[in-house]
Amino acid sequence: MKRIINFLCLFILSFGLLSCKSEAPVKVLFITGGHDYDRENFHAMLEKLPISYDHVEHPNAHQKLKADKIAEYDVVLLYDMPKNIAPEAQQDFIAMLNKGKGLVVLHHAFCSYDSWPEYVKIVGGRYHHYPWIKDGAEQKPSTFHHDTKLSVRVEDEKHPITKGITDFDIIDEAYGGTEILSTVQPLLSTNSPFNGPLVCWTNTYGKSRVVALTLGHDIQAWENPAFIKVLSQAIVWAK
């Protein structure tokens, strides 16, 4: 009987390992540029995720969004902050989303493309560098505060992105006075006076799943287990 039990345990363990190995990692196009970051530690964090990725920087990044080049990827991970985007690149970006390519917008990528109105519809929100209009009234530019303690609350415990996540604290850069569309699905919130009400949400654009996660400024966030888990599950879900 003992031999049978040992054999069954070995079989189950072997089957589990084979299943894990056979599950291909999510193939990610990782885009940066327009904002500096601690490359060594950020890339070390990415290596912990169930992904394989190619890294491209601006000004060459938009070329990778063309249909014949983006096809090989499951998800685009934005950690860039360019100011402008050419009309042709806008068309490629939208065409990519209309075909269902997953998109994860991380931290300062929330602050990109001030002059492109469609970007707020894609992301479901925007960090405004300049005064902006809401309900007919002028709003002040958005703000940022480094090294801010944020108490984060899980708004939807059943969503795949927040599965296994409980409320947590994180030291990160806070974004205040931002625009968030009422049509997004809230996942993580905070009541910090220095930050907008949400730090993570999902949106739909075209046929694509879009995730916005405003956390992730530096190693204080990148080493936070809750942040790593949320980012990992966001990429998998967006696929």
Spans of features found by a protein language model:
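Sec-dependent signal peptide recognition
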Residues: K2-L10
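A glycine-rich, often tryptophan-bearing local segment used as a flexible ligand/cofactor-contacting loop or short
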Residues: K83-P160
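Helical hinge/lid and interdomain linker segments adjacent to catalytic or ligand-binding clefts
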Residues: K27-I31, Y37-Y113
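Short, solvent-exposed loop/turn elements at domain surfaces
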Residues: D36-N41, A86-P87, N195-L198, Q220-N224
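Short, solvent-exposed loop/turn segments at secondary-structure junctions
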Residues: H35-D36, K83, F110-C111, S192-F194, ...
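Extracellular ligand-binding/catalytic regions of CAZymes and related secreted enzymes
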Residues: E23-V26, F194-G196, T204-K239
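C-terminal motif of bacterial Sec signal peptides marking the signal peptidase cleavage site
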Residues: L18-S19
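Catalytic beta-strand/loop cores that center a nucleophilic Ser/Cys/Thr
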Residues: E40, A44, L49, K140-R209
